[in-house]
From Swiss-Prot:
Modified-residue entries (Phosphotyrosine), positions: Y149, Y247
Domain Protein kinase, chain residue ranges per copy: 69-350
PANTHER family named in the record: OS01G0588500 PROTEIN-RELATED
Organism per entry: Arabidopsis thaliana (Mouse-ear cress)
UniProt feature coiled coil, ranges: none
Record-annotated active site: D199
Keywords assigned by UniProt, alphabetized: ATP-binding, Cell membrane, Kinase, Lipoprotein, Membrane, Myristate, Nucleotide-binding, Palmitate, Phosphoprotein, Plant defense, Serine/threonine-protein kinase, Transferase
Main location: membrane
Protein name (database record): Probable serine/threonine-protein kinase PBL8
Enzyme Commission number, as recorded: 2.7.11.1
This protein's encoding gene: PBL8
Chain positions with Phosphoserine modification: S203, S233
Start-end of Basic and acidic residues biased regions: 1-10
Phosphothreonine PTM sites in chain numbering: T58, T234, T239
């Protein structure tokens, strides 16, 4: 693999070696540390932890996989690098199976680029879920940083929503994608060591051949607050138009910051509009500013639904989806639902539209007509001043203090 750290560093740290390093650095602040079970990189480390499910590749092997990074193999380009399509042949190395892959080559931008690369390896090396893109391997050779992912045949949600040459996604498919992405975020937030994704947007939601949504690009992910901490303080990073307002203003990051970003993406899926579009009239350039006041108005919300979805959904389904987006986009983070609430709210919507997807059979489905929450009747008396901007409370700590868990009563 070559050397991707200093000369006296091993190419890859084992978890045991990392634990020994941590004991030596125990006096450092929490933000500088990780333990073998925590998906957080060490700020002084230049090499990833080794994981049984993640393969270390040589640069020569990845050149072979991508035909020397041929320009016509490029799948996309972004701020962190270029992604190429590749194919692992079973003759490449003993024990490897033949499969198509996506190879991301990071820009050579020094420490910051390396840290983002290392974050992806250390998060995706540990986290496995049907709605997270699978990290197959990596390469760390000299100043080269590469990542190898499973190949996602359908590309990004962004392309399907906004490319004029792409057939528009149906209502049922959009709801299916929204649910899959929500499950991915809920998994991160509910992990033993919670993870804040920090860069949830349509270009980071990839679709496989069955349109299963998978979150990709974990370069900005952060370990969530621990113990009595209420938030993580960090430099503001992400994408304009998706970042939560309180995070932009203060640098205070919580799981509810991701919920806001989810609300923006859901709004993009409902309207077919970009979060920020400078080609539109000035009052319509910021999607949230333009659409959110209409989301809770039954007379206006149908005016903002993507016209390409005409006759594909029921009015009731549109109201439910718009109401969910409304609360996800609350200015007050505490009024936003938890991602687990979002999942329960979206599950019953899988049986609407063109009925290609079977109806959900969860308890949430049975209670959905009454507000979208299991055991709704038991909790109804705890909702007060129900309506836009209301502060609602639930006796169950698994529910959010606002949003779908208690407030979406009409």
């Amino acid at each position: 693999m070559g050397n991707c750290g200093t000369r006296d560093e091993a190419a890859v740290f084992t978890p045991q070696a990392q634990a020994q390093q941590l004991q030596k650095k125990h006096s450092r602040s929490v933000s500088d540390l990780s333990d073998p079970s925590t998906p957080r990189f060490r700020d002084d480390s230049r090499t990833p932890i080794s994981y049984a499910q993640v393969i270390p590749f040589t640069l020569f092997e990845l050149e072979t996989i991508t035909k020397s990074f041929r320009p016509d193999y490029i799948l996309g380009e972004g701020g962190f690098g270029t992604v190429y399509k590749g194919y692992i042949d079973d003759n490449l190395r003993v024990g490897l199976k033949s499969l198509p892959v996506a190879v991301k080559v990071l820009n050579k931008e020094g420490l910051q680029g390396h840290r983002e690369w290392l974050t992806e390896v250390n998060f995706l090396g540990q986290l496995r879920h049907p709605n997270l893109v699978k990290l197959i391997g990596y390469c760390c050779e000299d100043d080269h940083r590469l990542l190898v992912y499973e190949f996602m045949l359908r590309g990004s949600l962004e392309n399907h929503l906004f490319r004029k040459t792409t057939a528009p996604l149906s209502w049922s498919r959009r709801m299916m994608i929204a649910l899959g992405a929500a499950k991915g975020l809920a998994f991160l937030h509910n992990a033993e060591r919670p993870v804040i994704y920090r860069d949830f947007k349509t270009s980071n939601i990839l679709l496989d051949s069955d349109y299963t949504a998978k979150l990709s690009d974990f370069g900005l992910a952060k370990a969530g607050p621990q113990g009595d901490e209420t938030h993580v303080s960090t430099r503001v990073m992400g994408t304009y138009g998706y970042a939560a307002p309180e995070y932009v203003m203060t640098g205070h990051l919580t799981a509810r910051s991701d919920v806001y970003s989810f609300g923006v993406v859901l709004l993009e899926m409902l309207t077919g509009r970009k979060s920020v579009d400078k080609t539109r009239p000035s009052k319509e350039q910021n999607l949230v500013d333009w659409a959110r006041p209409k989301l809770n108005d039954k007379r206006k919300l149908l005016q903002i639904i993507d016209p390409r979805l005409e006759n594909q959904y029921s009015v009731r389904a549109a109201q439910k989806a718009c109401s969910l987006a409304y609360y996800c986009l609350s200015q007050n983070p505490k009024a936003r639902p938890l991602m687990s609430d979002v999942v329960e709210t979206l599950e019953p919507l899988q049986c609407t539209g063109d009925a290609l997807i079977p109806c959900a059979t969860t308890t949430a489905g049975a209670a959905f007509a009454m507000g979208g929450v299991p055991d709704y009747r038991m909790h109804r008396r705890f909702a007060k001043n129900v309506g836009p901007g209301a502060i609602c409370r639930s006796p169950n700590p698994n529910y959010s203090p606002g949003g779908p868990a208690a407030c979406r009563v009409r």
